[in-house]
A protein has these predicted regions:
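A general structural motif
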Residues: 8-10, 40, 66-69, 102-103
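Conserved sequence signature across two-component system core domains
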Residues: 16-17, 46-49, 72
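Structural motif
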Residues: 16-20, 76-77, 110
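A short acidic (Asp/Glu
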Residues: 22-28, 56, 82-86, 116-120
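Conserved phosphotransfer microenvironments
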Residues: 52-99
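A short, hydrophobic beta-strand element within the central beta-sheet of small alpha/beta folds
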Residues: 71, 92-97, 101-120
Length: 146
């Protein structure tokens, strides 16, 4: 059976993390807290940069038209990609290079310094729509704010 996702809610969060489908995923509680604070959230899990981008491309018309709001939250490291240690930075760079530079993005990571270094290496333009944090409270605020 194949799953078809419809990202046509008003507040969509594309959450990119290679462990997001694991039952003991470390951020499961964070996701639940955000949803409990804002039941209008539609969290769309993606386990790779490529699957996230394919999903976003399929809704580009809606995103660009402002009909539907998307935010992206990502970890920095994904062991199912190569190179693994800068997957979040590569996602941000890909978004900027493919017409998604106006989407709000958060890198939620264990090392803000490393994330900023990787973003700089890839010449990511650090506009006000890109946030990097290690704090759960920042992630919750990002997820639930409109």
């Amino acid at each position: 059976m194949r799953q078809i996702e419809i990202g046509l809610y008003v507040n969509n969060i594309v959450w990119v993390d290679d462990n997001i489908l694991n039952a003991n995923w470390e951020n499961k509680g964070l996701m639940e807290m955000a949803y409990n604070k804002n039941r209008a959230l539609k969290i769309i899990p993606k386990i790779t940069t490529n699957t996230a981008m394919a999903f976003l491309k399929s809704f580009k018309t809606f995103i660009k038209g402002g009909t539907i709001k998307y935010k992206i939250i990502s970890d920095m490291t994904r062991n199912n990609e190569y190179p693994a240690d800068n997957a979040g930075a590569r996602l941000v760079k890909y978004l900027q290079n493919n017409g998604f530079g106006d989407i709000e993005i958060m890198i939620f990571t264990s090392s803000k310094e490393k994330a900023l270094r990787e973003l700089k290496k890839l010449n990511v333009v650090m506009n006000g729509r890109i946030k990097v944090t290690t704090f759960t409270s920042d992630a919750i605020n990002f997820l639930v704010s409109n």
